[in-house]
Amino acid sequence: ASILYTSGTTGKPKGAMLTHGNFTSNVEASIRQVGFHPSDNFLNILPLFHSFSFTANFMLPLSLGGCCSFVRSIKTITEDMRLLQPTVMLAVPLLAEKIYARIQEQMKKSMAARALRAAGLGALVHRRIRARFGGRLRLIGIGGAPTDPATLRGFQRIGIPVLEGYGLTECSPGVAYPSLASYVVGTVGQVLDNLEYKLLEPDATGAGELCVRGPSVMLGYYKNPGATAEVIDADGYLHTGDLARLDDRKNLTICGRRKALIVNREGKNIYPEEIEQVIERCPFVKDVIVLGYQVGGETGERVGAIIVPDD
């Protein structure tokens, strides 16, 4: 069992009390959902105090009888991948986006790569790229924040599927993961099969607060019954604070944080995270935050953005 502290992005850090049963139920459901194998070699890049890394990158491969490999440092990732030949790599969006940007930069500089692609031999270029990752990498799992769809599609073209999942520390942490067979870019897959879920107060687009209940939900916050009562209701549902919607195949799309929701003067719900993802694609933007603001006595909010330019 563990007490893992949340990042504190929504308030003061709180210790989520997670039992052995929480972790093992999450591991078992994740294996069924994604389709991991005993022959898989997981490359561990993220720190183990991160619940995503601890469960999916450490406990999961050990429970399978698979292999768990560790990089020496961020600077030696490429070299270590060639040596360790992983089949699975778990990462956060920033790392995946930097790796893909570096691939793109190297391809632009390489005359051989440009010539091969011009000759219709892009598959050969992609095979050489995969060889740099050890030649056995069959999927990259992403969690922690939204990922640029261009990065997801770019890795797919290379022949390395990137599966974007969703979770939070309070759920040990996985809530929804895609499968290789049915992944839809822009979604985080389906809710794990041992969790019950509901969308609270959905709007006209179907987006509502995601609430989940099941064996991987924490006992509560350590020595903080008040904070526990704020997120776990009388029926045992954990209120995630995240807005989500479902498609016809039950794939989940995360729209943003409930507290960040902007309601404009026409009463329309606007999800700032979706706008931020579009603005961040501009090469001249280093960082951006989209927020709502009011002018005078207006009802509703206008939408604004604070942008940090890329030097």
Q: What residues fall within each predicted segment?
A:
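Conserved AMP-binding A3 loop
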Residues: 1-27
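Active-site glycine-centered loops adjacent to acidic/histidine catalytic or metal-binding residues
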Residues: 47, 144, 167, 189, ...
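Conserved S/T- and glycine-rich ATP-binding loop of Class I adenylate-forming
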Residues: 6-9, 42, 89, 155, ...
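Adenylate-forming
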Residues: 26-30, 98-103, 140-141, 149-153, ...
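Active-site loops of AMP-binding adenylate-forming
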Residues: 20, 147, 153-161, 168-186, ...
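Conserved AMP-binding/adenylation subdomain of ANL enzymes
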Residues: 24-41, 48-128, 136, 161
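AMP-binding/adenylate-forming catalytic core of the ANL superfamily
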Residues: 214, 219-220, 243-311
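Conserved ATP/PPi-binding loop(s) of AMP-dependent carboxylate-activating enzymes
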Residues: 187-194, 203-231, 251, 266-270
